């Protein structure tokens, strides 16, 4: 079931380095929110904090609150592994398990959770591959290695793997940056379909992509080298691209910097 995300006064640190300052925003359920901004502005750092993936970096910590339907994902006793099951991640480059079969790639998470029923695994594999618009392309070779698929197919396989464990939120960190234009269009169409069932947050450097797929857009910027990234503004995507409130947003979207 898609859930709402709320960030309140979020500050992110890596050791003594203050990476992101004072972020507050809300992501409605069944909505695509795009994070845009120049390199180093903190958008991917914020994205990774939404399911505690940034914690794999030593010294990382978050101050403030990140709430999933009102529950603080950094609260006492909250298991990061459980958070990452509820809030899935699709990375910049397709990362299927290359020697594992297509089917086993999809159900790897379920197997880690102890699922052993072949019927259940088969059902989830088909449902997830259909959900990722990949089923018709791979249904006759489910036992073949996932690494043998094209780049675009591999990324859709990774999306199928992410949705197989029934998350509430999907995070996508530049999911099309390594893909050709045709594969990119397929992923964008898929994102539009997936938002019927999931809350989606996507980081992208592609302004046209943000305008095409997102319902709201958040613009992040960096004041200066060594300073933390900040959220400049967030609004409906149409307004951000046609009539932004902040001059920095307009300058970035129009290509004056970034």
From Swiss-Prot:
Entry keyword set: ATP-binding, Cell membrane, Membrane, Nucleotide-binding, Phosphate transport, Translocase, Transport
Record-level Gene Ontology MF annotations: ATP binding; ATP hydrolysis activity; ATPase-coupled phosphate ion transmembrane transporter activity
Gene3D superfamilies documented for this protein: P-loop containing nucleotide triphosphate hydrolases
Binding site for ATP: 37-44
EC class of the enzyme, as a word: translocase
InterPro entries to which the protein is assigned, alphabetical: AAA+_ATPase, ABC_transporter-like_ATP-bd, ABC_transporter-like_CS, P-loop_NTPase, PstB-like
Membrane-topology descriptor: Peripheral membrane protein
Protein name in UniProt: Phosphate import ATP-binding protein PstB
Organism encoding this protein: Rhodococcus jostii (strain RHA1)
């Amino acid at each position: 079931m898609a859930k709402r995300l709320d960030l309140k006064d979020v500050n992110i640190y890596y050791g003594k380095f203050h990476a992101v300052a004072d972020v507050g925003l809300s992501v409605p359920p069944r909505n695509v929110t795009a994070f845009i901004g120049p390199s180093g502005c903190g958008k991917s750092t914020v994205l990774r904090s939404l399911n505690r993936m940034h914690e794999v970096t030593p010294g990382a910590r978050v101050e403030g609150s990140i709430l999933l339907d009102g529950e603080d994902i950094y609260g006492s006793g909250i298991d990061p592994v459980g958070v990452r099951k509820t809030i899935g991640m699709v990375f910049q480059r397709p990362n299927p398990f290359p020697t594992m079969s297509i089917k086993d790639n999809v159900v790897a998470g379920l197997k880690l959770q102890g699922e052993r029923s072949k019927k259940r695994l088969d059902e989830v594999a088909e449902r997830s591959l259909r959900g990722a618009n990949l089923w018709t392309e791979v249904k006759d070779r489910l036992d073949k290695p996932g690494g043998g698929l094209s780049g675009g197919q591999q990324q859709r396989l990774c999306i199928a793997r992410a949705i197989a464990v029934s998350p509430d939120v999907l995070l996508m960190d530049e999911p099309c940056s390594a893909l050709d234009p045709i594969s990119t269009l397929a992923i964008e169409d898929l994102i539009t379909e997936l938002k019927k069932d999931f809350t989606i947050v996507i980081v992208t450097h592609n302004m046209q992509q943000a305008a095409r797929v997102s319902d709201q857009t958040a613009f992040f910027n960096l004041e200066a080298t060594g300073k933390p990234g900040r959220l400049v503004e967030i609004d409906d995507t149409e307004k951000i691209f046609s009539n932004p409130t902040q001059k920095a947003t307009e300058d970035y979207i129009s290509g004056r910097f970034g």
